[in-house]
Amino acid sequence: MSLAFDPTDDFADVADFQQDVTLLRPGTSDSWALAHAVRAVVRVSEARASGGDVTEDDVVWHLDAAEWDGSPQPGDVIVQSDARRWTILAARLTATGRWRCVCRDLAIAQGLDQYVDVEVAISTKDPAGAESVTWHPWRTGVPARIQPVRSTVEDDYQRRTVSSELKIYVADQLPLDETHRIRAPDGTTYRVVGCRNAERIDALMEIDVVEERD
């Protein structure tokens, strides 16, 4: 990825001038309101072979360095007024006094059109020493897409059960393990069995889950 400053490349194809954005630093409460951000034209490509279902949009944002005394870092998120989020992949300060930020917005073509809640298991003991596990909200309202992978039918002691495996795509990078589960809008819960791209800032996080059944 080239970060060389090219005024023609950076400003000849700008899509918007001096719009308000918010810069967020994931994992912290830090945020900065910036009023003079400039965005170039969005470049859309397919993130992987998916028939167009998974796309990645790349763009260059220019942030006025005079607006705050910090500096953008890879992994920071630029949020537009319409709530569209852009993850910064790389940033450099140019001779014009603006931060040139190469950003990406990974999106499912149909949209991350569901909002799921992530719950965490809390283990406690009663006065008699018996252990019990209860589930508590950990992260709510996470934009996601739930994608079925496969279903397996099993006969267990004359009882037929169906085991459903799914993938859940989220834009947020969440530190998940087996102590977490995901609750869908219809109340269905999914046990987390694995995840990918949790350490990458340039890809959607993929969560492998199994539907919980009584």
Write out the residue ranges for each language-model feature:
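Short, conserved turn/kink motifs that form compact alpha/beta structural patches or helix kinks used as
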Residues: 22-111, 130-214
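Active-site-proximal polar cores
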Residues: 1-35, 109-132
